[in-house]
Structure formats: C-alpha cells, structure tokens
Amino acid sequence: KREVWDAMADQMRFWMEKGVDGFRCDMACEVPLEFWQETISALRADYPGMYMLAEGEEPKLHSLSGFNSSYAWELHHLLNAIARGEKNIPELLEYIQKDAERHPADAFRLMFTSNHDENSWAGTEFERMGDAAKLMAVLTFTLPGGQPLIYTGQEMGWNKRFEFFEKDHIPAWEKNEYF
C-alpha cells in the first residue's frame, strides 16, 4: 500500500514539475481518502495553485481531501429525466438546494450533459435529451456552484457517438447553428 501511494504521488509530482496545473482523478471516491489528504496536501505545499477534479460526487472529496471540483452525476441524471418528462422543475430546485447544503461553499461542481462515458455508452445528449439538449446545456453553464464541462464536439453541436476504446475520427468544424 505505502509503495503504491508513494509511486502515485511521485508521478503526480513529476507532471507538476513539467508544468501540468492539476489532475482529473478517475474514480477518486474509490481511492482511500487518506491518500488524497496526504498527497494533495504535500503537492499543494509546492504547487498552491494545483487544481484537482474528482470523478466522484461525495462531499468529503472536497471537505476532507482537498479536491477543488467534483462531478455532479446526480444532476446529470436529473437533467436527462427532466428532458424525458419524468422529472420537473421542483426536483431541480430541490437538487440545487440539497447539493449546496452538502458541499462546501468553495466546491465547484462539474456540470455536464455529456462526457466520454455517457456519449459512448448511453448516447449523445441529442439522443438522450432530444429537443431539450440545448436548454440543458445552458443550465450546466448557469446553475449556481457549477463549472461546465464541454465534451468533444459539443461546442459544435456534433451529434456523434465516439468510440470509447478505438481511434475515432473527429469531424471537421463546419458552420452551423452553434457558431
């Protein structure tokens, strides 16, 4: 355990020394909190501006571990349900209040309508949200406490599933309704 923790911390320090300004940590909630507490604290001593994004939703990733931002997965699923007509604005307002109460005031919540997992496995935001996709994207940019995620091609309105484990062609930028 200690050897693995040290090796992981060494790799993070290596990349910080190369000029990386932070990390997105996959499945951060599955890594012991003690590792994050120790490692983030040690790295921030030398790199106080280091930015840490947790793929996870637990408030303790912020309050105990030192992550700046975490994925708002619950919001993502709620936006999909609203787009399908299964949930409504009262549930969104309840989520906003609950999320603000659960997370520290300085925690950024990564808000998104798509990402590499959702696009590959569940479909594009247009497939999942239909005509509501644009409105849901606006919400991810404007809800309180949020930090929007723009996934590959969203800035262009691409309605394409990208392969998860294969090389995939990125379409050329074309003039369209998004710019």
Regions found by a protein language model. Give the residues of each.
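Short glycine/proline-rich turn/loop motifs
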Residues: 1, 18-20, 115-123, 166
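Active-site-adjacent "subsite" loops/lids of carbohydrate-active enzymes
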Residues: 1-18, 28-29
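Alpha-helix N-cap and loop-to-helix initiation/capping positions
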Residues: 3, 30-31, 127-131
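Aromatic/hydrophobic pocket-lining residues that form the small-molecule binding cavity
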Residues: 5-8, 36, 133
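Active-site-proximal helices and loops of the catalytic beta/alpha 8
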Residues: 11, 21, 26-109, 139-142, ...
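Acidic/polar loop patches that form or flank catalytic/metal-binding clefts of enzymes
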Residues: 53-54, 145-152
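Active-site clefts of carbohydrate-active enzymes
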Residues: 103-128
